[in-house]
Swiss-Prot record:
Record key words, sorted: ATP-binding, Cytoplasm, Kinase, Nucleotide biosynthesis, Nucleotide-binding, Transferase
Keyword Nucleotide-binding: yes
Pathway: Purine metabolism; AMP biosynthesis via salvage pathway; AMP from ADP: step 1/1
Protein name (record): Adenylate kinase
Organism field: Brachyspira hyodysenteriae (strain ATCC 49526 / WA1)
Amino acid sequence: MLNIIFIGAPGVGKGTQSALIEKDYSISHIATGDMLRENIANGTELGKTAKSYMDKGELVPDSLVIDMLKDRIKKDDCKNGFMLDGFPRTIEQAKELSNILESLNYKISAVIDIFASEEIIIDRLLKRGRADDNEETIKNRLKVFENQSKPVLDYYSDKAKIIKIESIGTPEEVYAKIKKELDVL
């Protein structure tokens, strides 16, 4: 069973690489944003509660996201393994995730830290053409990501294999580096 945490700044290629990993290793890709939207769309109790926060423009509390994640990881499609994208973002979330996984008798196999230079990320995001992707906003998002991700990586340093991948080259070249690391786990 391969259980992966995927950490990377906006624009480093997490989505592209996650899709390739999901396909090759037959593991479920769990993105917290998608999970929230799915719970809301399905009208689950957790989804209704999350929607009440979102409708007020508030952040959905960690405890609610954790509960959704626990329900999600228990599903049959996670029995072969899973990949978490966008979670955990903080030490508190990482500790809660550890508690969940321990209760289910699961372990994190690896944490993939995918990175690129600020210049490359800014260039990629500006080319993406989203309304909220301007240089100042991107730099702020990168600073927030950097401040949050380093402590999470430190937390996992003695709990799982940390795989550092520089996101330079074609998506296929980057994936070849990831696959080489995952195949020895």
